[in-house]
From Swiss-Prot:
Disulfide bonds: 47-52, 70-712, 78-672, 134-392, 601-724
Peptidase M13 domain sequence ranges: 46-727
Keyword Electron transport appears in the UniProt entry: no
Record protein name field: Endothelin-converting enzyme homolog
Spans within the Cytoplasmic topological domain: 1-44
Transmembrane stretches, start-end: 45-65
Organism: Locusta migratoria
CDD domains with a match to the protein in the record: M13 (cd08662)
Classification lineage: Eukaryota, Metazoa, Ecdysozoa, Arthropoda, Hexapoda
Main location: membrane
Length: 727
C-alpha cells in the first residue's frame, strides 16, 4: 500500500468522474452534428480505465465536431485545439511537438537544479556548470558586457567595424584558417568529416556551399517580399556593431556592403529543391583536383592547417567529396573581384568576422541578445523572450546533450517503452514489405533488393546504453572544459571540442551506434548511409505513445512516425542507397522511370496546396511527403494485422468512433498546431516538410481505407478520384 494512497485515491475518483461527465456532454454535442459517425457501440461495454477516459477526453477536446471530415479532416481533428490554443507571444509556432518539448524541459530543469552531490558522473556535473553559466547566477555576463567579444576580435585579427583592423598584412587564406580551423566558425563554404556516401564504412572530408546568415537564399533574392527582413537584418547588424564600439553611420554603411556580398553568394547557390539527386551531387576527387578548379585559397594548406588540431598529415591526393563544384568555381570569380581592391578586401574581412560575431552574440549580455529581437520578429513573427531557464535547458542539451540524456532517462523514460517500440517497428516493417508485392510498377529483381533493404534497416530506440555508465559517459566529454562563470568562453571551448571530435572521425571506421540526436529530443530520424532509424526517448511519450492507450492510438501516432522514418529508406533520396548504406544504382531503369512518374504525382499534388496564397514547394518537400504517405499506409496495415491477431479492444467512452477511425484521428491530432504568418512563409521557403495541415490531408486523401472508414463520397476533397501512391 502506498504511503499517500488515501490522499490520491480521492483525487483520482474526482478527476475520473469529472472527465466522464465531460465526455458524456461533449459526445452528446458530437452526435448532434451532421457529420458525426454512426452509432457504433450502442449496447456494448466501454473502456473506462483512467488512461482510456483521459485519452477520449483529449481526442474530443482537440476536435471540431462541426467540421466535415470528408471536406477538411485537419479542421475536423484539430479545430478545437486551434481555437483553444492561441500562439504564445514568445513563440512563432505552437503545437503538440512544442508542448511535449516543454514538458521534457521541465523534467531536465528539475534534475539540473539538484545539488552537485546528486549527479552520477563528471559529465553530468559539467552539464550543471554549463547550465549555471547560461543562467548567469553571478551576473558575470552582464558585468563583462562586450569584453569577451572584443577580446576575441583581437585574437582573430581585428574588425574594421570596430576600428582595430589593418588591411596591410591581411590574407583571405589566413583569415579562413583562423576562423574555421581554430574557432570552428562559418563563412564562404562549409566542410566537415562525414560518412562517405559511396563507401559508408569510411569517413571522408565533405565540402559544400554555405555562408549565408539569413535562413534562405530567397531572403536575399526576393527583395520585394523580403524587404522587411533585409531592413531588420541591417538594423540588427548595426546595433551589434555599435554595441562593440562602432560609430552608427559608419557601421551601417559597412554592413550594407556585407549584405550585398552575402547577396552575391545567394545568387550562385543552388536552391534546395534542385539538390535532391544524391548521385548528381556526389563528386569524389583528390584534394589537388579541387585546387585546380576554385583556387581562391590553397586547399591543401587549408586542410593541413585544420589537421593540426589532431596532429595528422594530409596528402594532396587525399580523397574529398565536393557537393557543389559549380558554386566553388563561381565563388572563385566573386573572390577575385573583391580581392582586387583594398575596399573589397575590407568587405571580405568584415563578412568573415561578422559570421563569427553573429554566431557568438547570444552568449553576451542582454543588450546583445535584445538586438536580435527585431530580426527574429521579421523572420518568424515573434520576438522570442522565453524564460531564461527554458532557453538554458535547450542550450545545455545542445552542448552536452548525452549527459542531459542520462538524467532525463533516469527520471522520465520507462523501461517497458523500449521493447514495445521495437515490436511495433517490426510489425510496421513487415507491413511495408508485404505491400511491396502489390506494387506492379516495380520489377521482381528490384523488389527483392528492396525487401532485403527493409530487412537490413537497423533501429535505435530511447537512448544509447553507454550514457548510463558514468565512466563511459565521462570519456565522451573528458576533453571539454566547462567553468561556471565563463559562458562565452565555454562556447568557444565547445566549438573547438566539436571541431576536434569531428576531425578525429576521419581515420576511424563509421560507428553505426553513434546517435545524431540526444535522448530528450522530440523527433526521430533516418540515416541513409547507415540504413538506420532512430527514435529518442523524448518522443516515446503521450500523445505519441502511451502504454495505457488503445493500440489504435499508438499505431496512429507513434506508428506513423516509425513508418515515416522507415519509408525514408525508399524516398527519392533514400532509394539511391542500398541495404548497406552505399550510394549506387541498384534499381532497374524501367522501375526508376515508373517511380519518377509516381513521385511527380506527389509533387503536383502538394504544389497545389496553398497557405495565404503561397504554394507549397512540391519538389522541396518530396522526400518528406513520400515518407508521410508511405508511413501512414504501413502503420495502418500493421495495425490491421495486430487487430486480426489480438482480442478486440473495448471502444473509448463517449466517442462512438471505431478503433480504425481512432487510428486516423490520432495520426491527425499529432499535427494540431498554429504558426505566425511569418513562420509559415519561412517554412514554405526553407523546410523540407509540408505545413502540418497538409501532412494530414495529403496522406489521408491518398489512402482509400481512410475514406472507407469515414464514409467519404468519391469526389469529395478527402476522397479525390485521382490519388497518388508510391509505396
Amino acid at each position: 500500500m502506498s504511503f499517500n494512497f488515501s490522499r490520491y485515491s480521492g483525487a483520482y475518483t474526482t478527476t475520473f468522474s469529472f472527465l466522464l461527465l465531460a465526455l458524456l456532454i461533449v459526445s452528446a454535442v458530437l452526435l448532434s452534428r451532421p457529420y458525426a459517425p454512426a452509432l457504433l457501440h450502442a449496447e456494448e461495454a466501454y473502456c473506462v480505465s483512467m488512461s482510456c477516459v483521459t485519452a477520449a477526453a483529449s481526442v474530443l477536446s482537440l476536435m471540431d465536431a462541426t467540421a466535415d471530415p470528408c471536406s477538411d479532416f485537419y479542421q475536423y481533428a484539430c479545430g478545437g485545439w486551434v481555437r483553444a490554443n492561441p500562439i504564445p507571444d514568445t513563440k512563432s509556432m505552437w503545437g503538440t511537438f512544442v508542448k511535449l518539448e516543454q514538458q521534457n524541459q521541465l523534467v531536465i530543469k528539475n534534475v539540473l537544479e539538484q545539488p552537485m552531490s546528486e549527479f552520477k558522473s563528471e559529465a553530468e556535473r559539467k552539464a550543471k556548470l554549463y547550465y549555471m553559466s547560461c543562467l548567469d547566477v553571478n551576473d558575470t555576463i552582464e558585468t563583462l558586457g562586450p569584453k569577451p567579444m572584443l577580446d576575441l576580435l583581437v585574437k582573430i585579427g581585428g574588425w574594421n567595424i570596430t576600428g582595430n583592423f589593418s588591411i596591410k598584412n591581411w590574407s583571405l587564406q589566413k583569415s579562413l584558417e583562423t576562423l574555421q580551423n581554430r574557432y570552428n566558425m562559418g563563412g564562404l563554404f562549409t566542410w566537415a568529416v562525414g560518412e562517405d556516401d559511396r563507401d559508408s564504412k569510411k569517413h571522408i572530408i565533405q565540402i559544400d556551399q554555405g555562408g549565408l546568415t539569413l535562413p534562405t537564399r530567397d531572403n536575399y533574392l526576393n527583395e520585394t517580399m523580403d524587404d522587411k527582413v533585409l531592413s531588420a537584418y541591417l538594423e540588427y547588424m548595426t546595433k551589434i556593431g555599435v554595441l562593440l564600439g562602432g560609430e552608427e553611420k559608419n557601421v551601417r554603411t559597412q554592413m550594407k556592403a556585407v549584405i550585398e556580398f552575402e547577396t552575391e553568394l545567394a545568387k550562385i547557390m543552388s536552391p534546395q529543391e534542385d539538390r535532391r539527386d544524391e548521385e548528381k551531387l556526389y563528386n569524389n576527387m583528390e584534394l589537388d583536383k579541387v585546387q585546380g578548379r576554385p583556387p581562391f585559397i590553397n586547399w591543401h594548406a587549408f586542410f593541413s592547417n585544420a589537421m593540426e588540431n589532431i596532429t595528422r598529415k594530409i596528402s594532396k591526393k587525399e580523397k574529398v567529396v565536393v557537393y557543389a563544384p559549380e558554386y566553388l568555381e563561381k565563388l572563385n570569380d566573386i573572390i577575385r573581384n573583391y580581392t582586387n581592391t583594398t575596399d573589397g578586401k575590407i568587405i571580405l574581412n568584415n563578412y568573415l568576422v561578422w559570421q563569427t560575431v553573429r554566431s557568438m552574440t547570444s552568449y553576451l549580455s542582454k543588450a546583445f541578445r535584445d538586438a536580435y529581437k527585431g530580426l527574429r520578429k521579421a523572420l518568424v513573427g515573434s520576438e522570442g523572450g522565453e524564460k531564461p531557464w527554458r532557453y538554458c535547458v535547450t542550450d545545455t542539451n545542445n552542448v552536452i546533450g548525452f549527459a542531459i540524456g542520462a538524467m532525463f532517462v533516469r527520471e522520465a523514460f520507462h523501461g517497458n517503452s523500449k521493447p514495445a517500440a521495437e515490436n511495433m517497428i517490426n510489425q510496421i516493417r513487415t507491413a511495408f514489405k508485404s505491400n511491396l508485392k502489390n506494387l506492379k510498377w516495380m520489377d521482381a529483381e528490384t523488389r527483392r533488393a528492396a525487401e532485403k533493404k527493409a530487412d537490413a534497416i537497423s533501429d535505435m530506440i530511447g537512448f544509447p546504453d553507454y550514457i548510463l555508465n558514468p565512466e563511459e559517459l565521462d570519456k565522451k566529454y573528458k576533453d571539454l572544459e566547462i567553468k561556471e562563470d565563463e559562458y562565452f568562453e565555454n562556447n568557444l571551448r565547445v566549438n573547438k571540442y566539436n571541431l576536434k571530435s569531428n576531425l578525429e572521425k576521419l581515420d576511424q571506421p563509421v560507428n553505426k551506434t553513434r546517435w545524431g540526436m540526444t535522448p530528450p529530443t522530440v523527433n526521430a530520424y533516418y540515416t541513409p548511409t547507415k540504413n538506420q532509424i532512430v527514435f529518442p526517448a523524448g518522443i516515446l511519450q503521450a500523445p505519441f505513445y502511451d502504454i495505457g492507450h488503445p493500440k489504435s492510438m499508438n499505431y496512429g501516432a507513434m506508428g506513423v512516425v516509425m513508418g515515416h522514418e522507415l519509408t525514408h529508406a525508399f524516398d527519392d533520396q533514400g532509394r539511391e542507397y542500398d541495404q548497406n548504406g552505399n550510394l549506387h544504382k541498384w534499381w532497374n531503369n524501367q522501375t526508376i522511370e515508373a517511380f519518377k512518374k509516381r513521385t511527380q504525382c506527389v509533387v503536383d499534388q502538394y504544389s497545389n496546396y496553398t497557405v495565404d496564397n503561397k504554394h507549397v514547394n512540391g519538389k522541396q518537400t518530396l522526400g518528406e511527403n513520400i515518407a508521410d504517405n508511405g508511413g501512414l499506409k504501413a502503420a495502418y496495415h500493421a495495425y490491421l494485422e495486430w487487430e486480426q491477431r489480438n482480442p478486440r479492444e473495448l471502444p473509448l467512452p463517449g466517442l462512438n468512433f471505431s478503433h480504425k477511425q481512432l487510428f486516423f484521428l490520432s495520426f491527425a491530432q499529432v499535427w494540431c498546431s498554429a504558426s505566425t504568418d511569418e513562420a509559415i512563409k519561412l517554412q514554405l521557403e526553407k523546410d523540407p516538410h509540408a505545413p502540418p495541415k497538409f501532412r494530414v490531408i495529403g496522406p489521408l486523401s491518398n489512402l482509400q481505407e481512410f475514406s472507407t472508414e469515414f464514409r467519404c463520397p468519391l469526389g469529395s476533397k478527402m476522397n479525390p478520384v485521382h490519388k497518388c501512391e508510391v509505396w
